[in-house]
């Protein structure tokens, strides 16, 4: 039930019309009886917003339901009075409240008029007459109650008259500040003679924004002096609030007026300057800027034609139009492209080699390729664009190599990542028809570098995505094709851009997820992980000095013992790259910096030099993160050690086999350890091959008769896949069958066929590094990988005994020398 000013009476409900007719008839009957005798029993209608006060005329919306039924009951009786009482809680449901949820004091009201509304509800015009108090509830269904009426004391004292004058004075002040009810107030004040202070108090508080609880308190106050005193307090609060609101409005209007005045003055000043020739209009400024730009560039004719057309178009547009902004932005991009500007290349091999060696340790094959690139550029009087893809684990220096290449060639460097990119518009730009459209990353690279032959690094190309917006990998096909990228077309510019002189460097962790057509356009250079000796050199020559400089320290403040760095590498940073190692070095230096500052504040200079040793390293880094890579110092029966290769570098892979009685009575094999489909097939091949060649390796031995063999690959939470564990699985099964342990410190890798041939695999360098880390000094590699092994540096192969095999017979002789 809500009060409202809506008087729309269209689409009248027939039942409501009938109620109105009956009420008119009952009104006539009631007037004939006694207009001055109020009924002692009233139907009560709950209110939940604000209470009404005597002397008011107010509309009330009656919704379909029990309250509408009350109207019908009143229409059938000789009475047209109802009671209006406020609920105790504002959020109470007025259709479902009981007497215990209502205040005891309310008002009686006479129904003057009903205006039916579509949907079974009606708007009722009420005349509020007297205060009432609920004496005794009669029924709960329609909230009918026995009520008593409060009669006002008509005695007018001098004090009440003074109160009335104060109230009228405040109301007049309110009129000046808030003219919303000006007409109604003037009518009321014109008829007010101060002889009815109670009515004046009720009317005045009804005008305020007081809370429902404050208004209900006024309604329940029957003593005239107390009521008019409380009304005066509420009016003064309302006056203070209106003054504050008026002050805020005046400040806002003053600010707006000042801003408008400044705007008009600036516009007048601008117009005067233009008339005097002291200032140019926006058209002239923009056109002059664009002319100045492309006059400094060697713009191709096809681009010049587009620029000229757009400049002619810009002159015809109003500066305030949306099309002007679109055209200006388009010209801004067209003229900011460094047409014909190329940086001068340097082809000094000695200087290039010096820079590469200074920035990076090892990576000889990568450095060799860069020097070849420089040599070709020197002989050909200019270097055409190349596409190089650096593949390797995280933290091995792929991004920093890209920066070094740009430094060696004296070119600008721009890097962006396509990891997770799903919209081809990021590469080729958005159409100009879209709001906020802009060119793709490649044109942005040209803008930022301001040359047409920068080094652009496209990072994480193996993690590129696709969606309904397009396939960014397919968009890169045109970019990375030397035969096509000379005419690269960005969707936003819609003008051909020559990218043939750009040197593209891409980085990836693995090649498996890169589409073959894209992979075919790249020259792949692999960066393997680092061994202990390499990490030690990198930490000593690069990471520690750089971190010390960042922390504001020097070699006089802190030094690392080589054994401490080795301990850190083996126990805290056992990864393919050096990113975690670098973070650990910085962590140590931060703690050292804290101690130095604390000592300085305590004036203790004697402990300003710190040496990091294996013994005190744990004080800085906490407990070691890694234990030994080896699960077994001495290999038990049924266990063979393989070598694996992942996107994070090389790792050891243990294959464990155990034999249990079979419930089916047949020989059976079961594989666990998050093995992928290819590895599952390798286990089946190993099982079948061993079964077929059993007499060769274990003559007279039954093949796991009435047993189930369980093969497990530890670290079961890590997914594993690939064919290179074939010979390792056969060796594990043979060890279990013969009850003979595999040769200790032996690691192996190789794909097995059903006939026992051992095929080549990938990641020889990574697997060799993993073997050195796990202290496996006897290795078995396929014969097909001998050439890969021979190309490795001597320090990697030092101390290792490597056997190359073509058939599993060779593996058997090495793994089980005593059989």
UniProtKB/Swiss-Prot annotation:
Its main location: cytoplasm. ATP binds at residues 392-399. This is Lon protease. GO terms for biological process: cellular response to heat; protein quality control for misfolded or incompletely synthesized proteins. Residues 634-818 form the Lon proteolytic domain. The keyword Ubl conjugation does not apply. Residues 42-239 form the Lon N-terminal domain. Homohexamer. Organized in a ring with a central cavity. Residues 1-40 are annotated as: Disordered. It comes from Chlamydia trachomatis serovar D (strain ATCC VR-885 / DSM 19411 / UW-3/Cx). The active site is at 724, 767. HAMAP family: lon_bact. It is found in: Cytoplasm. Residues 1-14 have a biased composition (Polar residues). It catalyses: Hydrolysis of proteins in presence of ATP. It comes from the Bacteria. GO terms for molecular function: ATP binding; ATP hydrolysis activity; ATP-dependent peptidase activity; sequence-specific DNA binding; serine-type endopeptidase activity. Keywords: ATP-binding, Cytoplasm, Hydrolase, Nucleotide-binding, Protease, Serine protease, Stress response. Residues 18-38 have a biased composition (Basic and acidic residues). SUPFAM superfamilies: P-loop containing nucleoside triphosphate hydrolases (SSF52540), PUA domain-like (SSF88697), Ribosomal protein S5 domain 2-like (SSF54211). Belongs to the peptidase S16 family. Induction: By heat shock. ATP-dependent serine protease that mediates the selective degradation of mutant and abnormal proteins as well as certain short-lived regulatory proteins. Required for cellular homeostasis and for survival from DNA damage and developmental changes induced by stress. Degrades polypeptides processively to yield small peptide fragments that are 5 to 10 amino acids long. Binds to DNA in a double-stranded, site-specific manner. Its EC number is 3.4.21.53. The keyword Repeat does not apply. InterPro entries: AAA+_ATPase, ATPase_AAA_core, Lon_bac, Lon_bac/euk-typ, Lon_lid, Lon_proteolytic, Lon_Prtase, Lon_prtase_N. GO terms for cellular component: cytoplasm.
């Amino acid at each position: 039930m809500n009060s409202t000013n809506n008087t729309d009476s269209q689409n009248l409900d027939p039942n409501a019309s009938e109620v109105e007719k009956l009420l008119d008839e009952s009104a006539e009957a009631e007037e004939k009886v006694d207009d001055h005798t109020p009924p002692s029993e009233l139907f009560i209608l709950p209110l939940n917003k604000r209470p009404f006060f005597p002397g008011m005329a107010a509309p009330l919306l009656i919704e379909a339901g029990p309250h509408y039924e009350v109207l019908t009951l009143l229409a059938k009786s000789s009475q047209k009075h109802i009671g209006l009482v406020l609920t105790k809680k504002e959020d109470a449901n007025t259709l479902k409240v009981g007497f215990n949820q209502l205040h005891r004091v309310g008002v009686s009201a006479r129904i003057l008029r009903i205006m039916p509304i579509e949907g079974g509800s009606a708007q009722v015009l009420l005349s509020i007459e007297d205060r009432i108090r609920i004496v005794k509830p009669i029924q709960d269904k329609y909230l009918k109650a026995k009520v008593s009426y409060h009669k006002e004391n008509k005695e007018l004292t001098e004090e009440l008259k003074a109160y009335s004058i104060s109230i009228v004075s405040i109301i007049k002040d309110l009129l000046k500040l808030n003219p919303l009810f000006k007409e109604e107030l003037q009518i009321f004040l014109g008829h007010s003679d101060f002889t009815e202070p109670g009515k004046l108090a009720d009317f005045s508080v009804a005008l305020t924004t007081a809370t429902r609880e404050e208004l209900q308190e006024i309604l329940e106050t029957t003593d005239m002096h107390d009521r008019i005193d409380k009304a005066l307090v509420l009016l003064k609060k309302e006056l203070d609030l209106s003054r504050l609101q008026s002050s805020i409005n005046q400040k806002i209007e003053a600010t707006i007026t000042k801003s408008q005045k400044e705007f008009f003055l600036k516009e007048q000043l601008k117009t005067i300057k233009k008339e005097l020739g002291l200032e140019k209009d926006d058209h002239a400024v923009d056109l002059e800027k664009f002319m100045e730009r492309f006059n400094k560039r060697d713009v191709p004719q096809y681009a010049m034609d587009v620029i000229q057309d757009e400049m002619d178009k810009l002159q015809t547009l109003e500066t305030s139009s949306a099309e002007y902004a679109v055209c200006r932005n388009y010209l801004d991009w067209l003229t900011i492209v460094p047409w014909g500007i190329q940086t001068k290349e340097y082809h000094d091999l000695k200087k290039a080699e010096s820079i590469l060696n200074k920035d990076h340790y090892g990576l000889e094959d990568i450095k060799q390729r860069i020097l070849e690139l420089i040599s070709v550029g020197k002989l050909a009087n200019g270097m055409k664009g190349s596409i190089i893809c650096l593949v390797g684990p995280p933290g091995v220096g792929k991004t920093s190599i890209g920066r070094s290449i740009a430094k060696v060639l004296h070119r600008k460097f721009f890097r962006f990542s396509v990891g997770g990119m799903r919209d081809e518009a990021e590469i080729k730009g958005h159409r100009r028809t879209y709001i906020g459209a802009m060119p793709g990353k490649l044109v942005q690279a040209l803008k930022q570098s301001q040359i047409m032959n920068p080094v652009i690094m496209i990072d994480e190309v193996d993690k590129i995505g696709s969606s309904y917006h397009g396939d960014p990998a397919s968009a890169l096909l045109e970019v990375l094709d030397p035969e096509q990228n000379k005419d690269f077309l960005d969707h936003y510019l819609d003008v051909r851009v020559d990218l043939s002189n750009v040197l593209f460097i891409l980085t990836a962790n693995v090649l498996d997820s890169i589409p073959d057509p894209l992979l075919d356009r790249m020259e792949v250079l692999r960066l393997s992980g680092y061994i202990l000796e390499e990490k030690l050199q990198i930490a000593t020559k690069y990471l520690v000095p750089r971190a010390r400089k960042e922390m504001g320290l020097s070699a006089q403040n802190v030094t690392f013992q080589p054994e401490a760095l080795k301990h850190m590498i083996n126990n805290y940073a056992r990864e393919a790259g050096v990113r975690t190692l670098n973070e650990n070095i910085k962590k140590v230096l931060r703690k050292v910096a804290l101690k130095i500052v604390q000592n300085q504040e305590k004036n203790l200079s004697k402990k300003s030099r710190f040496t990091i040793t294996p013994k005190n390293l744990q004080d800085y880094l906490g407990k070691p993160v890694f234990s030994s890579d080896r699960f077994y110092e001495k290999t038990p029966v049924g266990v063979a050690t393989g070598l694996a290769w992942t996107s994070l570098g090389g790792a050891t892979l243990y294959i464990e086999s155990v034999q249990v009685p079979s419930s089916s009575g047949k020989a059976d094999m079961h594989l666990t350890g998050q093995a992928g489909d290819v590895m599952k097939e390798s286990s089946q091949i190993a099982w079948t091959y061993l079964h077929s060649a059993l007499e060769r390796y274990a003559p007279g031995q039954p093949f796991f008769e009435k047993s189930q063999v369980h093969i497990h690959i530890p670290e079961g939470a890590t997914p594993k896949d690939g064919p290179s564990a074939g010979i390792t699985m056969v060796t594990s099964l043979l060890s279990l069958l013969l009850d003979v342990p595999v040769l200790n410190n032996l690691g192996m890798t190789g794909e097995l066929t059903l006939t026992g041939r051992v095929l080549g695999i990938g990641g020889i360098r990574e697997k060799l590094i993993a073997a050195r880390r796990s202290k496996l000094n006897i290795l078995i590699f396929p014969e097909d990988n001998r050439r890969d092994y021979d190309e490795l540096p001597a320090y990697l192969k030092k101390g290792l005994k490597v056997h190359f095999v073509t058939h599993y017979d060779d593996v058997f002789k090495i793994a089980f020398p005593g059989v």
